[in-house]
Structures are given as structure tokens and as C-alpha cells.
Amino acid sequence: MKFKEQNKRKAITFSYDDGVTQDIRLIELLNKYGLKCTFNLNSELLGKPGILIRENQRISHYKVHPKDVKYIYDGHEVAVHTLTHPNLTTLDETEIIRQVEQDRMKLSELVGYEVVGMAYPCGGINNDDRVAEIIKNNTGVRYSRTITNTDSFEMQKNLYRFNPNVYHVLEYDRLMKMGEAFISLETETPQIFYIWGHSYEMDFQPDYWSKLEAFFALIGNKDDIFYGTNAEVLL
């Protein structure tokens, strides 16, 4: 954990999924406030167009192009989200390994460094002990994030089913309350505040981007907090 090397006991990290073009705007905001994020990509879906329908709104869900991955995510971390975004709990061992390890290898080639992180794809029950053990024992992945939020900032022992804290602006009240609590927290042991989401969700409501920036302004540039990618914070 890099923040321990800097004699800091608190760390904040972000994780955003799917590799959509809204990530570009998100990264501009992250950089403005000195924040770091891990972006979880599906290598076989890169470059593909897409539209989501949300409350009669058409929301862009265009994936970034493979050739742009390296420079778009420069300064942050790229991680595995599987080749094609299946629910891994429904697959056999061979297909789980293929979905994870081939995505990891393709992304590593795109970014020019070894990809070691992951976030489980699909909503609902998208991971279990069987899947986690297969990934741990058969791939180069060293940690993987779930979508099960926890109230605790304590460091977790199981990095292959690592639980985040809050689903960004879609849980705005919780996001701000946890942010304020983390800033004021005094601790002698490592504490991690982990936020996750999808950047295309910022387009669901006209004020979501401004709400996210307000949160960034609240938590950013604190001397006693380490801001790092998932790998920098967890490994």
C-alpha cells in the first residue's frame, strides 16, 4: 500500500466501469482535484456505439476506441472488466479464465503495463467464492471489486471480493455523509474510502456532474489523505 509508505493512514480511490466516452470528462474533473481512479474495460467491446434509454432519455453509451485507451487513461489505472461483460457466476471454469485473462492480456498490451486489477461485470449477484478462487488461482489478477457496498472504511482481507463504500452520485446523500465522515476521521490503522460507478450515469440528470464536482471539491487536496488508483491503494 503506497499510502503507508508515505506515512498516511487514510486513502481515497475510485473505480468506474465500462470504458465509455464520458470517462474523458470524468478524468478532467478527477485531475482538477488531484484524485485517482481505476477504469475497468471490456476489451472486445471497445470502439462500439451504444445507447441507453433512461426515463425516456437517450443516453450515450459509446465505448472508447482501442487506440485511444492509453492516452485517455494516462495517469490513472486500467483494469479488467472481462472481454464481453457476462455474469461470471453462470460460466464454467474455462470460460471464466478466458473472459478474465484474455481481457487482462489485451488491456495490458493497449496500455503498455501489466494490468492486475478487476471489477466484476453485471449487476445483481455477479460474484461468488467459486469465481473468486478461479480468478485468484488461474489469472494474473490480484484484486477484484464487487458492487456490494460496505459502511466500513477498514482494510479488507479478501482482495478478490473487495467491497466498495458507495455508488457515487446515485447515492448522493450517502456519498456526502461518508465523505465528511472520512475527512474528519482520526485513525491509527489504514482506512480506505472507495467510490464506484459509471460515468455515463452522470448524464441521467442535469445536476449530476455538478454534484460530483462538489463531492470532489469536498474530499480533494487534503494533506493527510493519499489519493491513488485501486492498485496503489490495495496492493
Give the location of each predicted region:
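A Trp-anchored, charged/polar loop motif used as the substrate-binding/catalytic surface
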Residues: V20, V169-L185
